[in-house]
Structure formats: structure tokens, C-alpha cells
Amino acid sequence: MLEDNERVDHLIKEGYEIIQNDEVFSFSTDALLLGYLTEVRKNDKVMDLCSGNGVIPLLLAAKSTQPIEGIEIQEQLVSMARRSFKLNDLNDRLTMHRMDLKDVYQTFQPAQYTLVTC
């Protein structure tokens, strides 16, 4: 499950694990604050832009049973996020799309989502 230079870190409060790699994006305090301070309502349709390794979808998944989608352009980070979702048995609720933000409107419509993080 882990590739070169990767490690598994723990999101202790949520009881989840996340794959990280110091050679690419690793989450920090700002991502934790965004995840902790974001309120997910019962019927929200959630999208996280520039998702990196999927930390925000993981943090929000601990607050809600709603499906959450993420968008990230870097293939390595998309792979790490998808493997983290699988590691936590969240593949049924969390989806990561590899996509440039310039192309989002070709696939998704803004009205589809009631909560967008970035």
C-alpha cells in the first residue's frame, strides 16, 4: 500500500490514518483548522478543491455521512488520497478526481454543491 518515501500518519481525533510523503504536499495546521472549523450540514453536497493528499475530505468524513468529492491535479497526491480513503474503508463515501481546476466546469456544475472547501 505504501510507495517509496511514504508513511502513515494518524488523525487521532477522527480515528483515521492518512498517507503522507515529505517529498510532496503534507498537510499542516491550516488544513486541520479548515477541517475542524467547517460545519457539514445533514444534506450538504461537499466538494474539496486542491485536495492534496485528501486530508480535508478525511476530516469532514468524520463529521458527516455525506459523500465527499475532492479534486487534485497531481497524480501522486491523488493516488495517496485514494489509498488513504481505502485504508480507512471510506471508498463508498469519498471520491478523488484527478483534474485541473480549469476543467472543473466541464464535469461539475457549481449548483451541484452546497459546501466547497479549498
State each model region's role.
Residues 37-118:
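Conserved SAM/SAH cofactor-binding pocket of Class I
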